A protein has these predicted regions:
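Acidic, surface-exposed loops and disordered segments
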Residues: 1-211
Length: 211
């Protein structure tokens, strides 16, 4: 089903490799979003509880997420410092120390809930057209976010949602060959929430030198 949006919306005019648009978008509001939050929350809580039990009993098995991509793979050393810097800033705003596992889990659970935003979004890309399908999806998302902001609507990519495919499989008919790459949220940012005042540092774009 094609998304019904204004013809002058920039998000439908975004560039695409040979106009293939080899990605799909699923949107959830109302009761469907509530079911998704419950499902995601349950999977998240089960994993956290399993880790707590494993600390007491090494034989406890940790549930393995059914993600389509290795979302928890360690960041390469070249970019890891930037990732650590943002993590320290994020948890610091919440007053959470590195050793505070429960506190970190509370923050991450808010991500899983998509911050209770009225719209939850999910993006799928054709596996046989990677990396171009992922590039197109990224162009679409950035354009969508900018277009939404121009209308007073805030947004946030929520990559942690791609840790589990099961919840979206239960709610949407996903075309064969499409892989779940990221989620996102649309709504209105709480101006009183300290996290919304966070300004993440942006490493400079690295230009390659000519030979």
């Amino acid at each position: 089903m094609a998304l019904n949006v204004e013809k002058n919306d920039f998000s439908v005019r975004m560039a695409s490799r040979r106009s293939t648009r080899a990605f799909r978008v699923a949107l959830a509001t109302g009761e469907r979003a509530a079911r998704l939050r419950e499902h995601y929350g349950r999977l998240f809580d089960e994993e956290i509880a399993a880790h707590a039990r494993k600390a007491e009993d090494p034989d406890v098995e940790i549930p393995v997420p059914d993600s389509d991509f290795p979302v928890r793979k360690r960041y390469p050393d070249e970019v890891r410092p930037a990732q650590i810097e943002v993590a320290k800033l994020l948890y610091g705003i919440h007053g959470i120390e590195r050793a505070d596992i429960e506190g970190r889990s509370r923050v991450n659970r808010r991500n899983v809930m998509a911050f209770d935003a009225p719209v939850m979004g999910f993006v799928f890309v054709r596996e046989d057209m990677l990396p171009w399908s992922a590039m197109d999806a990224g162009l679409m998302l950035q354009t969508l976010f900018l277009s939404a902001k121009s209308r007073g609507i805030d947004s946030c990519p929520v990559g942690i949602l791609a840790t589990w495919r099961e919840p979206v499989e239960a709610e949407f008919e996903i075309s064969e060959g499409y892989r779940f790459i990221t989620g996102f949220a649309l709504g209105y940012a709480d101006p009183e929430a300290p996290i919304n005042a966070m300004q993440a540092p942006r490493p400079p774009i690295q230009l390659l030198r000519g030979r």
